[in-house]
Regions:
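Conserved phosphate-donor
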Residues: 152-164, 169-211
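Catalytic beta/alpha-barrel core
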Residues: 110-116, 136-138, 159
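Gly/Ala-rich phosphate-binding loop of Rossmann-like dinucleotide-binding domains
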Residues: 13-14, 231
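Short beta-strand/loop segments at the ligand-binding rim of alpha/beta enzyme cores
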Residues: 126-136
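Conserved post-catalytic alpha-helical subdomain immediately downstream of the catalytic base
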Residues: 207-289, 301-303, 315
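Conserved N-terminal subdomain of the carbohydrate kinase-like
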Residues: 14-108, 275-315
Length: 315
């Protein structure tokens, strides 16, 4: 169970936050699997069944070894059995989430990775209520929606691999307080606008891992870790924290990202080790002790699960 938004929310719940996805899941097997997994980690599903309901998106991830022996992942969007396209993302409808808007008041964070009219309406309502609005684009968006998003979002984070740059982030009229560009194996760079004008870019190198199993989802761990440290008191607390505190929070996010690369799957580590082991390993990474023996663990028993059927496949 993954996807940028789903991963970030699940990881935040794992770290002790109350996380609420706003979605339109139906009762198909994929949706039931997603709901069960989210509930396992403490994610709240109060807003997960908005109408009209639809099939839950399904993506297939493969992990292979490159010529250099390192793991690489790729995704496919078609069923290997029937050949049909698997269900894709469908945003919630603006009309159907109007009842949620008043409930967003007092939220610490509103996170969005795909733009739609409903997402922008909810992000604006959240910002009015004091939330830190975080925008992490996963695909290219309609220009008008993007312009509107940048007038609302306080934190904009994106991968250099997808967006060499994102025009307008620090432009006049943008709400951006922090821009983060991840650089893969070389770390990330960031600039802020906590003062009168945008700062220069600052680089934070990546944290090395003792063993590399899969990089998928590392950026989501970075986001969740950063928010867990920097966004507890919404946008007001974020602004008051100062540049040094933001750097510490980003470094914590990078530590979680590094740790996650030691496991297959975007959130594989959550299933593989107990929380006490996670805490010890993060402490070890944070202190600079990256010896492989520091990461020895007894994996949790894995319960075999059947593949989720494609909705288009004949029964």
């Amino acid at each position: 169970v993954g996807g940028t938004c789903g991963n970030v929310l699940s990881i935040l719940a794992y770290l002790g936050w109350e996380a609420f996805p706003i979605a339109r899941m139906n009762s198909d097997p994929a949706s039931q699997r997603v709901k069960a997994d989210m509930q396992r980690w403490g994610v709240r599903l109060d807003f997960a069944a908005c109408t009209p309901a639809t099939h839950t998106p399904i993506i297939i991830q493969e992990i292979r070894r490159g010529r250099d022996g390192l793991p690489v992942h790729r995704f496919s969007w078609s069923c290997r059995r029937c050949g049909h396209w698997l269900p894709g993302f469908k945003p919630v409808v603006a009309k159907s989430v109007e009842w949620i808007l008043p409930k967003l008041d007092g939220a610490s964070v509103f996170f969005m990775d795909r733009l739609s009219r409903a997402a922008l309406n909810m992000s604006a309502a959240s910002a009015d209520g004091g939330a830190l609005v975080v925008f992490e684009p996963s695909v290219r968006s309609d220009g008008r929606l993007l312009t509107e998003a940048l007038r609302i979002a306080h934190v904009v984070k994106y991968a250099e691999q997808r967006f060499p740059e994102l025009a307008g982030v620090m432009a006049k009229g943008a709400a951006t307080l922090l821009e983060i560009q991840t650089l893969g194996a070389t770390g990330l760079r960031f600039r802020h606008k906590l003062g009168a004008r945008p700062s220069t870019w600052q680089h934070l190198p990546a944290i090395a891992v003792p063993a590399l199993a899969d990089t998928c989802g590392a950026g989501d761990w970075c986001t969740a870790g950063f928010l867990a440290m920097a966004a507890k008191r919404g946008v007001e607390g974020f602004q008051m924290a100062g540049v040094e505190a933001l750097g510490v929070a980003l470094r914590y996010g990078q530590t979680l990202a590094s740790w996650s690369c030691g496991f297959e799957g975007a959130r594989g580590g959550m299933y593989a080790v107990e929380r006490s082991v996670f805490n010890a390993q993060i402490k070890s990474l944070s202190s600079g002790r990256r010896r492989a023996q520091s990461f020895e663990h007894r994996p949790r028993p894995r319960i075999p699960t059947a593949a989720v059927p494609c909705p288009a496949c004949p029964l």
